[in-house]
Amino acid sequence: MENPFVYGEVVPGDAFVDREDELDRLVSDLGNGQKVFLISPRRYGKSSLIRQALDALGRRGALTIDLTVSSYSSYVAFLEGYARAVATVESKWDRARAWLTEAIGSTRPEIRYEPKDTGGGRFSVAFPHATTARDVNRLANDVFALPGKLAADRKRTVVIALDEFQAIDSFNGGSVEHALRAAAQRQRQVGYVFAGSEPSLMEKMIGPRRPFYKAGPVLRLNKISHTLFADFIERRFTKSGIRPEQGVADAIIDLAGNLPYDVQRLAHEAWDDVKARGARKVTLEDLHHTLARLLSEQETIFEALWQRLTLHQRATLRAVVMQGGREIHSADARERHRLGAASTIQKSLAGLTDQDVLIKEGPRYLVVDSLLREWVARRTF
């Protein structure tokens, strides 16, 4: 029996939790050619939601393209990956090469098929002649026009997902935003989802002074209902032949901070531990043994992170954990945790947020990794 809980990869349909309303809205908007902004903190299941939406649209006949912007090292590399993804969607090598050459021949792309020793191969696109800023801007206009040409040529809806979209800021973001917005707004048969896991950056990108202001609907992911998540965990355990003790599902959600990634991780690891012993029931004691194992395995990583923090950042992080992320600036919290001036606290909070240790959710600060939160809580200072 395969482990029924999935983490560390895009979650498949049968292991996907809730999000029916968000999924229905995303599928409907993208199928109608909308340009959707999907904003979500890390570990909320954004990428899995996108995958579910693309799969649903693909079954309806749409051509779907999925790119992760942060995986590219430069603007030109991103444009090369973008062109390759559009040209090769449901296309064989010869057809893709001919289509792309005709579509952007003026930019003189180098198009190759690189076979692998194990069979199959990879279609590669390079733009070696894009050497100046003017060349790159011209190239961007040609590449960003490709989805519209593909939709017209195939007479099918095209849907493009650009995950970790906030990473375009590292590619001279303003220029990219202008070029992409200009192309996208002319493509009625192309749906876009611009998805990002850094809410503050994404909110700025759709602000009044940015090209994507009012470009399309905005979908913000919130946490999954505790009750729905608990029901899911209990069903998945039971269906796999392992009976959860009363309270186990609730404990998993609480220990994991109700973060979808962390919930799936803790449930997955607990299932593995119980299965390895040949048991047919998972108990609260089993869960805490699993948690202790995971903390032990992460000890070196967390200790290295801790050593990188300033003394005040350490104190602030511990205060966030002990206060549940609330009222960190209050006089009581400042005195109890010896945090000093409010301005110093704010500087440490900003530094911890920049390092992806904390995230701000409404008035609260939360530790991004629930295991790190538990590790900090268990340390003696």
Which residues make up each language-model segment?
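A short, basic N-terminal segment
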Residues: 1-36, 41, 359
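C-terminal leucine-rich, beta-strand-based interaction scaffolds used for sensing/assembly
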Residues: 2-3, 152, 247, 292, ...
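P-loop NTPase Walker A phosphate-binding motif
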Residues: 41-67
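Conserved phosphate-binding/catalytic loops and adjacent sensor/switch elements of nucleotide-binding enzymes
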Residues: 58-149
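Conserved Walker B catalytic segment
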Residues: 126-198, 207
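Short regulatory helix/loop adjacent to the ATP-binding pocket of P-loop NTPases
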Residues: 199-216
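Conserved AAA+ ATPase "SRH/arginine-finger" region at the nucleotide-binding site
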Residues: 217-228
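Amphipathic alpha-helical "lid/sensor" segments that cap RecA-like P-loop NTPase cores
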Residues: 230-300
